[in-house]
A protein has these predicted regions:
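Active-site and donor-binding regions of nucleotide-sugar-utilizing enzymes
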Residues: 9-149
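Conserved catalytic-core segment of nucleotide-activated headgroup transferases in glycan assembly
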Residues: 17-29, 141-211, 306, 310-312
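Catalytic donor nucleotide-activated moiety binding site of glycosyltransferases and closely related
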Residues: 34-44, 48, 188-224
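Active-site regions of enzymes building and remodeling cell-envelope glycoconjugates
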Residues: 48-58, 80-89, 211-222, 254, ...
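Donor nucleotide-activated moiety binding/catalytic core segment of transferases
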Residues: 55-61, 203-250
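A donor-sugar binding/catalytic signature common to diverse glycosyltransferases
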Residues: 73-74, 79-87, 225-268
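Catalytic binding pocket for nucleotide-activated donors in carbohydrate/polymer assembly enzymes
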Residues: 132, 212, 244-306
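C-terminal amphipathic helix plus adjacent low-complexity
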Residues: 279, 285-351
Length: 351
């Protein structure tokens, strides 16, 4: 007798969630199960015609998923199902004096699906300390599409394309400092530019300044939203600062130039002076052998699994958790203030 389809909920709070959760949706469907999306008000509706959206939290409760997947830092405690953290990037210590936010335990999740050596050991230590969640090293779901060999993007020109994707973190983001430099390089070098911002980089004056530059220069495209793999494949070199997006880009075997990276290393071409960026990009375009070897070593430290089956491992982790651990762990912290704040944010006041 066939089992009924299992239901899962994909919980999106910002636009970056789509590229992270869609590989999961694909695997859920491949197994004959059902996925639905819940979008917070902060997440634009970019769903496709064949994707199911659940519009209210009450409907999400009625959907009764066996698991909910969230790339963000929170998930409503009152929704049914195993709460699964799938992360929105790799651990990057942007500030020297602070532990990476990647490792902050807020008491929302039952499962953390880690990505590789840069995240798993620390989370295993946290699992022993807290006792109310389990850690599974699955690899990052977004990376599945990187290694599936099924994605191709047509290039409209043979000119080198530089992708600029700064972080949003105040005091670290290069977006304010590098506008004049990018404008100068776009005017003087035979390169095309794609400029994208993190959804949280929302300074309207800054956005307008970059948009005006793109409007005036035919070789500059301000795309606002980074479409992940599609955007990466259209470019040859990334210019960045200290964003974890550099790891994603380097996983494709592409070099990155950084401006004042907080943790530079041999896998990056890091510069401290904006005047050196042009030459650094020239060097990156030659793909030096030593640099490319360091890139491979560094990205393997972050993403251990490159077989395109990370989403499958995430679903297997849910099954294992339900079979062996659900109901047998310590209780999560009460989290009363966080829970109240989230209910107020979502305007959900029911018991």
């Amino acid at each position: 007798m066939e089992r009924p389809p299992r239901r899962y909920l994909l919980y999106a709070s910002l636009s970056y969630a789509y590229a992270i959760l869609r590989p999961l949706q694909e695997e859920i469907r491949r197994r004959g199960d059902e996925a639905a999306w819940f979008l917070e008000p902060s997440c634009p509706d970019m769903l496709l015609l064949d994707e199911r959206r659940i519009s209210t939290l009450r409907d999400a409760i009625r959907w009764n998923p066996i698991a909910i997947f969230a790339p963000g830092n929170h998930i409503p405690d009152f929704l049914p199902g195993v709460k699964v953290a799938v992360f929105h990037g790799y651990p990057m210590k942007k500030r020297i004096e602070k532990i990476d936010d990647h490792f902050t335990i807020r008491g929302w999740f039952d499962i953390y699906c880690t990505q590789g050596p840069s995240s798993t050991p620390y989370f295993r230590m946290l699992e022993k300390r807290h006792g109310f969640f389990k850690v599974y090293e699955t690899g990052w779901t977004k990376a599945d599409s990187f290694f599936s060999n099924s994605y191709h993007v047509e290039r409209s020109s043979d000119r080198p394309v530089i992708l600029y994707s700064p972080t949003f973190t105040k005091g670290i983001s290069s977006a304010w400092d590098l506008l004049p430099t990018i404008k100068r390089l776009a005017a003087t070098r035979q390169w095309d530019w794609i400029i994208t911002f993190h959804p949280k980089l929302d300074d309207q004056q800054l956005i307008d300044d970059y948009q005006r530059m793109a409007d005036k220069m035919p070789n500059v495209e301000f795309a606002r939203l980074n479409k992940g793999l599609e955007t990466f494949l259209r470019s040859d070199v990334m210019l960045c600062d200290s964003s974890s997006i550099t790891v994603e880009y380097m996983m494709l075997g592409k070099p990155v130039v950084t401006y004042r990276n907080t943790h530079p290393g041999p896998h990056l071409i890091d510069v401290r002076n904006a005047d050196d960026i042009g030459q650094a990009i020239e060097t990156a375009l030659t793909r030096p052998e030593a640099l490319m070897q360091e890139i491979d070593r560094y990205t393997s430290h972050h993403e251990a699994h490159r077989d395109g089956h990370n989403s499958s491992r995430v679903l297997d982790a849910v099954d294992d958790f339900i079979a062996r651990h659900a109901g047998h762990l310590r209780h999560k912290p009460l989290n009363l203030i966080r829970r109240l704040k989230l209910r107020l944010k979502l305007r959900y006041y029911h018991l």
